[in-house]
């Protein structure tokens, strides 16, 4: 049995098909229930959606204490991370929006999709992870985007992790529309209440999902809690 564990903000720990995956591991965020050291020698894969500090987080430090872990991001961001580690390494894999990324020793499908946001190193993205146990879409930082409908049409991810804080990303109303396009069955809100400017009530997302009569379950996690699948 796998799980999705919210670590505050947009950071998640995912256990899928026997792998431990971290997405956007800003583990020093104000809501975080964990420390970087908690993950020493425990991580198989780190995925980062874009280069903003609240998403890249402690990726480099985590790679240093997880010598076998792989890192995947868009090409320009991956190059930056490799430089921080001292130069080119096969542990850091640069990819782009498109089909599945080939990751040595990791038997998961990982695909990047466009996100409507900003980024200094490469294109901002959302990411889809497809394993034998389930499929999970992490939307990254994004506004509402038409490409989400294509993700839903092609892959219908079973679990969607969507921002609801507004100001920098979608709010709850737009996130509900994103859920409709993604066709996800389970939705976990993220990227809210870290700072006053992105304060939001996740119950509002539930209300919109009910109002739109969507076939989706909204799972509200407290930092550190997990959803098992």
From Swiss-Prot:
Keyword presence, Hydrolase: yes
Entry GO MF terms: hydrolase activity
Keywords assigned: Hydrolase
InterPro entries noted in UniProt: Metallo-B-lactamas, RibonucZ/Hydroxyglut_hydro, UPF0173, UPF0173_UPF0282_UlaG_hydrolase
Keyword Lipid biosynthesis included in the entry's annotation: no
Family, similarity comment: Belongs to the UPF0173 family.
Protein name: UPF0173 metal-dependent hydrolase Hbut_0886
